[in-house]
C-alpha cells in the first residue's frame, strides 16, 4: 500500500517536471501556475526570471471564506479565473503561459482557463 502511494507520488512529480521544463515565465509574460489539492484550488502569476510571485488567489483566501466559492468545484474555478484576470490587468499583463502542472487540462482546470480567457488573458 505504501509502495503504491510512493509510486503515485513519483509519477505525479514526473508529470509536473515534464510539463514545466517547457514553460518559462517572464515579467512581460508570466507563468499562470494552477495547483489543486483535495479541497482547494490556487492560481498564481509567477515571473521565473526574478523568482517572484506577481499575484495570486485561492479558494482558501479570506475573501472566499464562508461563501459558495470556498470549495473545489467548477464555480470556484470560474471565480478564480476571473479574479486572476483582474489581478493581471491591474499589473498590465495581457499574456501568460498556462502551467497546468501534473493535472489534465480537463474539468476544473479548463473552467479556470476559460474564465481567465474571458477576463482578457491570452494563452
UniProtKB/Swiss-Prot annotation:
SUPFAM superfamilies: Translational machinery components
GO molecular function: 5S rRNA binding; structural constituent of ribosome
Source species, domain of life: Bacteria
Pfam families on file: Ribosomal_L18p (PF00861)
Single GO cellular component term: cytosolic large ribosomal subunit
Disulfide-linked positions: none
GO BP: translation
UniProt keyword terms in alphabetical order: Ribonucleoprotein, Ribosomal protein, RNA-binding, rRNA-binding
Function: This is one of the proteins that bind and probably mediate the attachment of the 5S RNA into the large ribosomal subunit, where it forms part of the central protuberance.
Similarity field: Belongs to the universal ribosomal protein uL18 family.
Complexes and interactors: Part of the 50S ribosomal subunit; part of the 5S rRNA/L5/L18/L25 subcomplex. Contacts the 5S and 23S rRNAs.
Protein name (database record): Large ribosomal subunit protein uL18
Organism: Protochlamydia amoebophila (strain UWE25)
Amino acid at each position: 500500500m505504501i509502495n503504491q502511494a510512493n509510486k503515485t507520488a513519483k509519477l505525479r512529480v514526473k508529470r509536473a517536471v515534464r510539463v514545466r521544463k517547457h514553460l518559462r515565465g517572464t515579467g512581460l509574460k508570466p507563468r499562470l501556475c494552477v495547483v489543486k489539492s483535495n479541497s482547494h484550488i490556487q492560481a498564481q502569476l509567477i515571473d521565473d526570471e526574478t523568482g517572484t510571485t506577481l499575484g495570486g488567489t485561492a479558494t482558501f483566501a479570506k475573501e472566499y471564506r464562508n461563501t459558495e466559492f470556498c470549495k473545489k468545484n467548477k464555480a470556484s474555478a470560474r471565480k478564480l479565473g476571473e479574479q486572476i484576470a483582474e489581478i493581471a490587468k491591474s499589473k498590465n499583463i495581457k499574456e501568460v503561459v498556462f502551467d497546468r502542472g501534473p493535472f489534465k487540462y480537463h474539468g476544473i482546470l479548463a473552467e479556470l482557463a476559460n474564465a481567465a480567457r474571458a477576463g482578457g488573458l491570452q494563452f
